[in-house]
Amino acid sequence: METNQLFSLDNLITILPECVLIICLLTILMIDVITKKSVWLSNIALLGLLTSTFILLFQLTNNEVGFTAFLGSFQVDGFTIAFRCLLTLSSALCIPLSTEYIRRSGMTQAEFLILLLTATLGGMFLCGANDLVTIFVSLECLSLSSYLLAGQAKKDIRSNEASLKYLLMGGASSSILVYGFSWLYGLSGGELQLSKIVNGISSQDIYLSSAVSLDGKTFGALGLWVAFVCILVGIGFKISAVPFHQWTPDVYEGSPTPVVAFLSVGSKAAGLALATRLLSIVFPAIEDQWHIVLEIVAFLSMVFGNLIAATQTSMKRMLAYSSISQAGYLLIAILVGNSDGYASMITYLLIYTFMNLGAFACTVIFGLRTGTDQIRDYTGLYLKDPWLAFALSICLLSLAGMPPLAGFFGKLYLFWCGWQSHLYLLVYTGLITSVISLYYYLRVVKAMMTKEVKEMSTYVREYVTPSMSIFSSSSIELGLTLCVLASSILGFFMNPLIDVTKQSMLVNNFLVF
């Protein structure tokens, strides 16, 4: 390994967005140690994340990407850059959500921001990781930071419980994932890079000798299947797909709400990027078979997530099961497996970022003013805070896919890609479960919009009405306004978004590894 090549200027420019975040992270750490004043810490983190986002957008429109860096351990292409951009954007939106929450809950702001930036860095490196070691190190960077973020409310026993559950189940899933990596390493003859693993496996006699044959049909190497199942468990945990979702409701309910907002978008985006890269590169030999397995996982996620969400009484638990169902929708894009499918996944994730973070922003605001997240306690909110009730309604209806909101157009393109790839069962399931989701989303909207004063909940009766919510200088309400606008109008710009995404992937040869 040549040190000069490893730390060349070209390599450093490749990870310039990550370098910006590292500088911001160290700056926050030094300021906290020296002055203990946290006035500018959020602004520094937000500036760093926005700067990284703009750099990534510039790289996305630059046709000279589509290569590997750091001796082949980091892949640079349009797909990678788009997902890294989604991560920085979601983290940037989480900072306004957290400012007031941190002050009220007694959390340490510097600690929260450092962990958030570290988790973002781990997710960004994970999106571009091109060898097994880089994948695992990046995944653990994201995971360990997420475990600590979940337990940030140290005085809240629910947060401590959520952090412990997340740690135990996350550690178990990581162990299974590494076991799958060990099978790939052995089957390939000691290769680490993903493309070399495929070549190594196909050239080994063990691949043919361990093939499973049923009725004359070859089902690939048994060892390769073991690796696939282990990797599916690890990635399924990360994206909250059934049946690897058990941690999601408890962790979402117990963790600080700004942390949950990040986990629902950032962690899912990084996991989907990893799943797409691994499945499309490493397992082409058993593609027909793993498609069947992934179709079952997507089907169960959509059905189970929406049915259980309809029975929830807590807003955060409802959004947790909603997140599980969203994972099922997004798996359709991986199964499509072409530029249209990947473009639909990125576009829907962009829309999902705004509408989901908008819903969590409303949950944060209502929780700070009332101290509850029970759905029944939202009854009559429109009479006290019309703007908050309207904003939450827009975000929830967009999540349900109601036209003409952005969520409708995102799902429409996603399902259209699935239909074109003959995934009829999943498309029908997605349509039916989207209708089911209307029930529990509209239940919240109906409760908020009631005009009967006598039906107003006790918490809403004591609700302190803000003076000018829409034009408030509060960072969380400014962030909420941005999310509501994006959830409302982003769908009208679907064609330009899709064209840019598809073009960047085709130009950068994402589909040719």
UniProtKB/Swiss-Prot annotation:
Its EC number is 7.1.1.-. GO terms for biological process: ATP synthesis coupled electron transport; photosynthesis, light reaction. Its main location: plastid. It is found in: Plastid, Chloroplast thylakoid membrane. Keywords: Chloroplast, Membrane, NAD, NADP, Plastid, Plastoquinone, Quinone, Thylakoid, Translocase, Transmembrane, Transmembrane helix, Transport. The keyword Transport applies. It is an enzyme of class 7 (translocase). The chain crosses the membrane at residues 11-31, 38-58, 78-98, 112-132, 133-153, 167-187, 219-239, 256-276, 290-310, 318-338, 348-368, 389-409, 422-442, 478-498. It catalyses: a plastoquinone + NADH + (n+1) H(+)(in) = a plastoquinol + NAD(+) + n H(+)(out); a plastoquinone + NADPH + (n+1) H(+)(in) = a plastoquinol + NADP(+) + n H(+)(out). One of its GO terms (molecular function) is NADH dehydrogenase (ubiquinone) activity. It is a multi-pass membrane protein. The keyword Plastid applies. GO terms for cellular component: chloroplast thylakoid membrane. Belongs to the complex I subunit 2 family. PANTHER family: NADH DEHYDROGENASE (PTHR22773). NDH is composed of at least 16 different subunits, 5 of which are encoded in the nucleus. NDH shuttles electrons from NAD(P)H:plastoquinone, via FMN and iron-sulfur (Fe-S) centers, to quinones in the photosynthetic chain and possibly in a chloroplast respiratory chain. The immediate electron acceptor for the enzyme in this species is believed to be plastoquinone. Couples the redox reaction to proton translocation, and thus conserves the redox energy in a proton gradient. This is NAD(P)H-quinone oxidoreductase subunit 2, chloroplastic. It comes from Staurastrum punctulatum. The gene is ndhB.
